[in-house]
């Protein structure tokens, strides 16, 4: 077993060797390097064909028509394009948007920007298990609601929202429904027809493909219109201008093809490893799982635990042989407690002591067992240094202690 161990697959994944091999054929003068928009010669035609094949692989994985796939630079851009694009196009119908407090920052910050432009946004509270209560969603809908944006799988706590039911609610009321599916594509069966989704964002680097490329599904029936946010050349049916990066698109297509083929065998293996990790941690006192652990309500690759009476940052230092994260990679640089955990009602102490373990293609049983032992050992050591742990063990109710500020 090689150290350090990588258990941060929800932040990014290494590229699959098969993806790299495929991409190498689309870069040099001996390969297919043409611009797919060059319609007058073979170099362009070959590049365009490669893009079409990749587009088909991506559409196949999510049950879409290949004409409904728009390439972007990644899921953050896809979220921006979907939310701003739909809000701007349909603003004459209304200016009210509904989302969830635990969404990715790419959704929340985009909504904040729209608020500055005069849109109104309702940020719904999730339940304590991280899931959205659909009656609260229905109650929040107004006559001027034009867009609802709810993620499929949460990037921090891995809970799976009932996208199908939300899709039905939106269709019945003719409200546009956007889903950030960055953490679910390739891990859960996703079919945009069944889920009644209008716009869906997804990424490549969370699925063993290259960074810097992603996609947005834009429904054709019923036809959804969005206003472009990048102009110049009218690529991607006018929705996203810019020369298509063929090698990245081919890499993403190959990654999605592999995912479709191997998902059925890969996910049960990863679920078994995740459950092994979870049961290994059960032996530790005062540990709490964040988000629902109910069957079907959590993605099989995610485990987010809070270890009470231990500071998350010091635990991360003790676990430097294991790549894990506190919060999401996009926000873990700030020492603020995770806004996702605060939204599900965790106090500051538990939010600060949370660690996200996310598993993927190359995680092994040996690595999981090593992780369990190292976490146990580190927690015992850190708690020995904690006066709060000592007081807790003596039966003192810490919530009743009055602290003096110097």
UniProtKB/Swiss-Prot annotation:
It is an enzyme of class 2 (transferase). The keyword Electron transport does not apply. GO terms for biological process: [2Fe-2S] cluster assembly. It holds the Pfam family Aminotran_5. Master enzyme that delivers sulfur to a number of partners involved in Fe-S cluster assembly, tRNA modification or cofactor biosynthesis. Catalyzes the removal of elemental sulfur atoms from cysteine to produce alanine. Functions as a sulfur delivery protein for Fe-S cluster synthesis onto IscU, an Fe-S scaffold assembly protein, as well as other S acceptor proteins. Homodimer. Forms a heterotetramer with IscU, interacts with other sulfur acceptors. This is Cysteine desulfurase IscS.
